[in-house]
UniProtKB/Swiss-Prot annotation:
Protein name, entry field: Large ribosomal subunit protein bL17
Key words, A-Z: Ribonucleoprotein, Ribosomal protein
SUPFAM superfamilies in alphabetical order: Prokaryotic ribosomal protein L17
Gene: rplQ
Disordered as annotated region, ranges: 125-189
Molecular function GO labels: structural constituent of ribosome
Quaternary assembly: Part of the 50S ribosomal subunit. Contacts protein L32.
Cross-referenced Pfam families: Ribosomal_L17 (PF01196)
Gene Ontology BP annotations: translation
Organism of derivation: Mycobacterium ulcerans (strain Agy99)
Length: 189
């Protein structure tokens, strides 16, 4: 049994929300990134990711399910021919939302929603190789910097003491000078 979506309808009725999300998804798949209000971007993210999941499966049934929502056949072809295969190795997280400055006219919070185009999935062997390399580097690195840091720390303490000594001398000279002027100005009885 169909149940209505909870929460606000993004400026209208349920049918308006469906049309709005379909149009936003069409623009997203056509251009790769769009700028819209933040609530619309947050509503579009799961909608678009479900459509991309259908495109990854690539069956006729999935194509017809997407065509129910997106009416532009060229965009659906792009979705199934390019976007779906690109995300074949990725398990979700196909879109990214980046907040940008508010809209000038009404100060509405704006965001850019875009398709993630970087490959982030790595093989376990590659990941294990990088972990070993980082552990080896971290074991070799601490012995040298600690030895180098100790003399540097001693030099820094000596430099701050040297800087503090002239400043203290200047302060006492200034205090003495002000005491002399106070004595000259004081009335004598």
């Amino acid at each position: 049994m169909p149940k209505p979506t909870k929460g606000p309808r993004l400026g209208g009725s349920s049918s308006h929300q469906k049309a709005l999300l379909a149009n936003l998804a069409t623009s997203l798949f056509e251009h790769g990134r769009i700028k819209t209000t933040e609530p619309k971007a947050r509503a579009l993210r799961p909608y678009a990711e479900k459509l991309i999941t259908h495109a990854k499966k690539g069956a006729l049934h999935n194509r017809r399910e997407v065509l129910k929502k997106i009416r532009d056949k060229d965009v659906v072809h792009t979705l199934f021919a390019e976007i779906g295969p690109f995300f074949a190795d990725r398990e979700g997280g196909y879109t990214r939302i980046i907040k940008v400055e508010p809209r000038k006219g009404d100060n509405a919070p704006m965001a850019v929603i875009e398709l993630v185009r970087e490959k982030t999935v790595t093989s376990e062997a590659d990941r294990a190789r990088r972990v070993k390399a980082s552990q080896a580097a971290s074991q070799d690195a601490p012995s040298e910097p600690q030895a180098a840091e100790e003399p540097a720390a001693e030099e820094a303490v000596a430099a701050t003491e040297a800087e503090a000594a002239p400043a203290d001398a200047e302060a006492t000279d200034a205090e003495a000078g002000s005491a002399d002027t106070d004595a000259d100005e004081a009335p004598q009885n």
